[in-house]
Amino acid sequence: MGNNVVVLGTQWGDEGKGKIVDLLTERAKYVVRYQGGHNAGHTLVINGEKTVLHLIPSGILRENVTSIIGNGVVLSPAALMKEMKELEDRGIPVRERLLLSEACPLILDYHVALDNAREKARGAKAIGTTGRGIGPAYEDKVARRGLRVGDLFDKETFAEKLKEVMEYHNFQLVNYYKAEAVDYQKVLDDTMAVADILTSMVVDVSDLLDQARQRGDFVMFEGAQGTLLDIDHGTYPYVTSSNTTAGGVATGSGLGPRYVDYVLGILKAYSTRVGAGPFPTELFDETGEFLCKQGNEFGATTGRRRRTGWLDTVAVRRAVQLNSLSGFCLTKLDVLDGLKEVKLCVAYRMPDGREVTTTPLAADDWKGVEPIYETMPGWSESTFGVKDRSGLPQAALNYIKRIEELTGVPIDIISTGPDRTETMILRDPFDA
């Protein structure tokens, strides 16, 4: 039995994690975010009603579930307040269900200004960040100058620390980026206005999780973005600023690494990517357009069109290695309905002619990589909303089986639509 279950993306994000976390939290006592910030976009559809969460864990819609934002998350007070209000306006008692780590770094206005100034300065070499201040906030954390949720308990000291760090960042903005300075008093006033709300939700997350473990409570750890965007193991520098892999669970929540019982990798039936960076299986033809249209591939956070392509099992195998995956949840299988043939990338051909079955390590080594495909028959029957494996077309079952063979990981859950009911649970992670 797995009490501590991790749900994370195995590709470049946008795999459909939010729905699966929401579904599995029916049995969970706690849901924990452990990295990222409000650059995530987790879409839930329940009885036809759509909810998009960026910062608050997907368990917030469940009664009797406590949602926790762990220390690995960079927290924007403005974004949190906005999201809380939207949920509270719908009658969801967020403050009764949400807890925060005092060690969460704060994202403030100057982080956003820096993020946008840097992307503008990069020009054609822009990384394609969400422009929400995530990277600069993590930089401040590592440089040990960042302000944290716990700093809000002492408002006088907070004001002094804020003044010092803003002098540093405003100097950069004005003198290097030729941008406008951020107003200190406004940042201070805005933050102080919500300080008591934030501090009222603070708990010792590591201790809480250890007590939950000792009681045998079910805990779900909700990843954001995807494995291939990991700051250390992703397609650097076209990555996010946090550890999106399973290792981030321990460091970003305070749970001891030995206590992770099951790691569920969310795997989209094809590949997508937002922003710049390597993408060997990207399609620029009518099939790519088909996947974008059928899959509604537009970012929940930015609204940007996602790049689309065939499923890359070479990249996915890297995710298997990095996360020690226990099983997959295959999502958006229904998007492939109607295609005469489907392709799986099984290897890469390097510029020198070599065939490799592992991903390059350095970003420059991805240049000129060509995908080697295995082509399989498609299916004309609809898989949308199918809730039993026996109801899937044989060609779809063959596709699923081949993914399992190529990755060495079983597909334990199959999603055939956006609603939480449109799902087949072949093996429940909490029972594995």
Curated annotation (Swiss-Prot):
Name this protein carries in UniProt: Adenylosuccinate synthetase
SUPFAM superfamilies: P-loop containing nucleoside triphosphate hydrolases
Pathway annotation from the record: Purine metabolism; AMP biosynthesis via de novo pathway; AMP from IMP: step 1/2
Gene3D superfamilies: Adenylosuccinate Synthetase, subunit A, domain 1, Adenylosuccinate Synthetase, subunit A, domain 2, Adenylosuccinate Synthetase, subunit A, domain 3
Residues noted as binding Mg(2+) in the record, renumbered to the chain: 14, 41
Reaction catalysis annotation: IMP + L-aspartate + GTP = N(6)-(1,2-dicarboxyethyl)-AMP + GDP + phosphate + 2 H(+)
UniProt keyword annotations, A-Z: Cytoplasm, GTP-binding, Ligase, Magnesium, Metal-binding, Nucleotide-binding, Purine biosynthesis
SMART domains from the UniProt entry: Adenylsucc_synt
Keyword Kinase in record: no
Assembly information from the UniProt record: Homodimer.
Binding site for GTP: 13-19, 41-43, 306, 332-334, 415-417
Sites where the protein binds substrate: 300-306
Top EC category: ligase
EC number: 6.3.4.4
Gene source species: Escherichia coli (strain K12)
